[in-house]
Amino acid sequence: GRQSAALLVVAAEPSGRPWQDRVFDLRVDDHQEPLVELARLLSVARAYHHMNEGDEQVTRGNIDAAVEEYERAETLLPGESEPIFWHAVTLASVGRVDESLPLFAEAFRLRPEWRELVPRLAPAQLLPDDPEMIARIVAAGR
């Protein structure tokens, strides 16, 4: 019956790195509506692609480009907290704390557990080691 579906998309030109050439490799093995589920998974995969590209832009110092990628991910995953949270972390990490606070508040509203992660980000060097800033972030939305 109609219980499975798959989608494999590869780069038009091989890079010599097969693990990078698979743009999407998705499958649904058992679902009542496999094409609907495959479409949902494709949206999730696209969103994570944008989040990964955002992370890559951060490492290159292109913060505005990173923010654009995180915003694209947020559009593809409405109501999901993860792209909002990492968008906020990126802004706070470059001193744009005031701009990040509404995003943190929204991420915390959607998933309160993110609030617990924030103090751990300074030791991981994902946020500055600034207790006052960390306290402002943790208090966002309260």
Residue ranges of each PLM-predicted region?
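TPR alpha-solenoid repeat register
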Residues: P83, L117-V118
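TPR-adjacent "capping" and linker segments in tetratricopeptide-repeat scaffold/adaptor proteins
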Residues: L7-V10, L26-H50
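Canonical tetratricopeptide repeat
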Residues: N52, W86, R120-L121
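Short coil turns that delineate tetratricopeptide repeat
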Residues: V44, P78, P112-E113
